[in-house]
Amino acid sequence: MARKIVITSGKGGVGKTTIAVRLGLCLAARGDRVVLADADVGLNNADVICGVENSVQFDLSDVIEGRCRAMQALVRHPESANFFILASGSPSRLISPQAMRLVLDGLAPRFDYVLIDSPAGIGSGFHRAAACAEEALVVTTPHISSLREADKVTDVLRSYRLKKGELVVNMVRGDLVVDGEILSPREIADILKIPLAGILPQEDGVFLGESTGARRG
């Protein structure tokens, strides 16, 4: 039976979906069968990031509304034979947590991992995704605004009593950590009271000015 992991964040623009895709590719590369379910209904972009948007014939909405079976809606990632994407689509009615869980539970026996890309924040879409998961990865950046929202997410996740919750700190600039301009990933994990699973560096050399507020208040 698959491990069901929700990848979430308190704030948009922190790289959550990109990290979900990269995680899926890494797991698939070691031989695991992985499906990434885009739970950001109506604002889905996991298929775009994976480069399969033109290959999507059916999506999560179609499965829930009975137009196809779950396996028919999966699109294979072009870089891996073991990694599949389930796009969310735009449903004609509100998708309930129970309906989404039914779909993902149906897929779980065929896969080693079910990754659930949650909408940012703690709205209804977040709760729908969290209700389907057994584990969570919270993605944040060192920006103070991102940390504040990640704190809200971790607080709410505790109410779900998941088996495991871990943190990924994205867009980290080591020079600013060394200079004391921003909190280190370890300090961030301690503040949020959640184990640190991974650190990803800032790739483009651009770091928003608000980041320097993370340590100074």
Where are these regions (language model features)?
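Inter-motif core of Ras-like GTPase G domains
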Residues: 123-144
